[in-house]
């Protein structure tokens, strides 16, 4: 694992920079960037004058694990040059172009936006590699702009050196860091020291634990000091050479090819048309079939009746014969229950009267 710190101030005296580089090697860092900061518009006086510092003592031996041990590895620390421009207006930001010789003289280009318009323009720019969010950036960061920045391959840098300052800087650091993590979901975030004092420098493992305080997972915090800075350096190489470069180190060529493949996978669609398992019905035969949508159709039928008119046909005239009138057949009518009950009661009364009359006649005869 390769660890990076991409922000060491170049305005410090050379002995102090040398002591800081030796401390970086003790903590396990493999690469650093010495930064030249410009406030406002850049000019010819800002052409890169940074020289690589030679460390001759035994402290240049670093560790591969990131712990403070000496003499376990013979790796020498790599040094990159970086231009950091503090932009307050769009006129200052528009000076950063690929045709500018000042920009071409540095390995990495970064911007510190102090205005929301500069930040929005930087998220859609092809001329920079890193956007540094400082505690002086007093504007609201929108998630849409952060995701646009990620799609462009630009990284957002957070300086953890502000934690060791006053309370206001500490509060502003956690507010900015937590909002960036929520907007980017932990992608394309770089953690760097301010590079002004050796007391603010921390090891990569300390930074991995620090990332938990503002929402990063352990892997994301570890990538913020290893994978993401490494990808930013590769992005700077392709930006400077416009995709065509002569690479003498085969390991760097391998990293460039892997980075291009990762970028292609992130930007191109996957063309994955296979549905999820929960959307697939498994029949008894064991085959998987995609359920077809069922549609119900309702049909309505209408019937129309047409009245047929019969034309009268002429009948021959014949002599009339007297005919016997016939009564029309009477249709049987259904009697109700009330009528049947009244009929039965009337017949019973009649039979009772007849019985009384018969008894009276017998008595008279006697």
UniProtKB/Swiss-Prot annotation:
Which terms are listed as keywords in the entry? Hydrolase, Nucleus, tRNA processing
The free-text function statement in the UniProt record for this protein reads: Component of ribonuclease P, a protein complex that generates mature tRNA molecules by cleaving their 5'-ends.
GO CC, sorted alphabetically, is: nucleolar ribonuclease P complex; ribonuclease MRP complex
On whether Hydrolase is a keyword of this UniProt record, the answer is yes
Enzyme Commission number, as recorded: 3.1.26.5
Catalysed reactions, as listed in the record: Endonucleolytic cleavage of RNA, removing 5'-extranucleotides from tRNA precursor
Subcellular location(s): the record lists: Nucleus
What Pfam families does its record include? Answer: RNase_P_p30
| Enzyme type, top EC level | hydrolase
Q: What is this protein called?
A: Ribonuclease P protein subunit drpp30
Member of which family?
A: Belongs to the eukaryotic/archaeal RNase P protein component 3 family.
**Chief site of localization:** nucleus
Gene Ontology biological process terms in this record:
rRNA processing; tRNA processing
Q: What is the lineage of its organism?
A: Eukaryota, Amoebozoa, Evosea, Eumycetozoa, Dictyostelia
Q: Where is the composition biased (Basic and acidic residues)?
A: 275-290, 352-366
One annotated GO molecular function is: ribonuclease P RNA binding
Where do the record's region annotations for Disordered lie?
Answer: 265-366
Q: Which organism is it from?
A: Dictyostelium discoideum
Segments of skewed composition (Low complexity): 291-324, 333-351
């Amino acid at each position: 694992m390769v660890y990076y710190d991409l922000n060491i101030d170049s305005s410090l005296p050379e002995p102090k920079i040398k002591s800081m580089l030796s401390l970086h090697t003790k903590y396990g860092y493999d690469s650093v960037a010495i930064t030249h900061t410009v406030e406002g518009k850049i000019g010819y006086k800002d052409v890169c004058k940074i020289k690589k510092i030679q460390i001759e003592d035994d402290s240049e031996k670093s560790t591969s694990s990131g712990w403070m041990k000496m003499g376990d590895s013979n790796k020498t620390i790599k040094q990159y040059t970086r231009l950091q421009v503090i932009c307050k207006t769009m006129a200052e930001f528009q000076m950063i172009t690929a045709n500018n010789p000042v920009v071409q003289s540095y390995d990495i280009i970064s911007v510190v936006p102090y205005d929301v318009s500069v930040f929005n323009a930087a998220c859609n720019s092809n001329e920079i590699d890193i956007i540094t969010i400082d505690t002086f950036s007093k504007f609201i960061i929108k998630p849409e702009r952060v995701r646009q920045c990620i799609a462009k391959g630009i990284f957002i840098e957070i300086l953890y050196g502000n934690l060791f300052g006053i309370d206001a800087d500490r509060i502003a650091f956690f507010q900015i860091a937590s909002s960036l993590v929520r907007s980017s979901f932990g992608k394309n975030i770089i953690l760097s020291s301010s590079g002004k004092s050796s007391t603010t420098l921390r090891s990569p493992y300390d930074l991995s634990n620090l990332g938990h305080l503002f929402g990063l997972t352990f892997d994301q915090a570890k990538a913020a000091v290893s994978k993401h800075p490494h990808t930013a350096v590769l992005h700077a190489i392709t930006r400077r050479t416009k995709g065509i470069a002569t690479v003498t180190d085969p390991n760097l060529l391998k990293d460039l090819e892997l980075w291009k493949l990762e970028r292609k996978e992130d930007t191109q669609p996957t063309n994955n048309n296979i549905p999820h398992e929960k959307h697939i019905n498994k029949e008894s035969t064991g085959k998987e079939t995609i359920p077809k949508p069922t549609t119900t159709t309702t049909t309505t039928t209408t019937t129309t009746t047409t009245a047929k008119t019969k034309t009268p046909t002429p009948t021959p005239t014949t002599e009339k014969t007297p005919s016997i009138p016939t009564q029309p057949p009477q249709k049987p009518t259904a009697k109700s229950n009330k009528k049947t009950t009244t009929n039965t009661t009337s017949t019973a009364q009649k039979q009772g009267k007849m019985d009384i009359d018969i008894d009276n006649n017998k008595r008279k005869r006697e």
